[in-house]
A protein has these predicted regions:
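Metabolite-binding pocket within alpha/beta catalytic cores that recognizes anionic/polar moieties
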Residues: 1-156
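Generic non-transmembrane alpha-helical segments
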Residues: 13, 17, 163, 167-178, ...
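Non-catalytic positions within long, well-ordered alpha-helices that form the structural scaffold/packing
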Residues: 101-104, 202, 221
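Short acidic/polar active-site loop segments enriched in Thr and Asp
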Residues: 106, 207, 226
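Metal-dependent peptidase/peptidase-like ectodomains
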Residues: 145-187
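Active-site/ligand-binding-proximal alpha/beta "capping" segment
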Residues: 171-207, 265
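Zn-dependent metallopeptidase/amidohydrolase metal-coordination segment
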Residues: 211-249
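His/Asp/Glu-rich mid-to-C-terminal helical/loop segments that flank catalytic regions of hydrolases
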Residues: 238-272
Length: 272
């Protein structure tokens, strides 16, 4: 369970460094951290300086909080996220979302790099998350509930806000960006899925599978933050193509689509 005292300690540290008051948060997935470099007047705070923050060891993830502005909006960006497969607790994985809420964030964009399960999709596509499937039997809200942070029994019928999704769709159409829509399945990792597991995941109704996003989205929902999720489909999931999977492929594909990704996210933020 997240402790209010810990959240406030982290908040006080950030506010002692910058007077920028962010209303929009973004969590940047593997290979997508370059968006943070587009923020104007940015302040960079290493995770190691923030109390109660973990540090990601995943390739493609820096470890700093970047606070600045874009499109006339103040933004706090996580340049690097924490993954459950790294051995962090779900409290550690999701603590940054609690900090964002304390800093004043009202809307959150969660991004990730993941594998395409839907065979109509292709590597390099962007996918707007419409819903998710939690395959892990874990939930960041397990344990005592602090009513100051959110309700005990959370309605998750609309984790990914419809109004915000409509904005993203409108931006993609205006910019002639191909934007898929689909269901994201959370897989703990760090192993990729087996071909049999991918067949199961497809049967369950997922269009993409990855190792993040769902814990943060659930805590954002619990905190009352309107959330939207955007996936960069960096590879076809295991067994679809006759080739092995690698994290290098994930980073390489994310690099190729970063300009399109930045354009979509920047314009979306300006319309929030």
């Amino acid at each position: 369970m997240h402790k209010m005292a810990d959240i406030l300690e982290s908040k006080n540290l950030v506010e002692s460094i910058t007077n920028i008051k962010p209303t929009i948060g973004i969590i940047l997935g593997s290979g997508l951290g370059s968006f943070a470099d587009t923020l104007e007047g940015a302040v960079h705070i290493p995770y190691s300086n923030i109390p109660h923050f973990a540090k990601s060891e995943a390739v493609g993830h820096s470890n700093e909080l970047v606070i600045g502005s874009i499109g006339g909006k103040n933004v706090v960006a996580m340049k690097g996220r924490f993954h459950y497969y790294e051995g962090f607790t779900l409290d550690q994985v999701t603590f940054p979302v609690r900090l964002m809420k304390a800093l004043g964030v009202e809307k959150l964009i969660i991004t990730n790099a993941c594998g395409a399960v839907n065979t109509d999709f292709s590597p390099g596509d962007l996918m707007l998350i419409t819903d998710h499937i939690n395959l892990t039997a874990n939930n960041p809200l397990i344990g005592p509930n602090n009513p100051d942070l959110g309700v005990r029994f959370l309605d998750v019928s609309e984790v990914y806000n419809k109004a915000l999704r409509s904005i993203v769709i409108g931006v993609a159409k205006a910019q002639n960006i191909t934007l898929r829509q689909g269901v994201y399945a959370w897989w703990t990792g760090p192993t990729y899925e087996t071909p049999a597991e991918i067949r199961m995941i497809r049967t369950l109704g997922a269009d993409a599978v990855g190792m993040s996003t769902v814990p943060e989205a659930l805590i954002a929902r619990h905190a009352g933050i309107d959330t939207v999720g955007i996936s960069c489909l960096t590879n076809m999931a295991c067994g679809i193509l006759d080739q092995p999977l690698s994290h290098e492929e994930v980073i390489e594909t994310a690099e190729k689509v970063k300009a399109t990704f930045i354009k979509l996210v920047a314009e979306t933020i300006s319309r929030f």
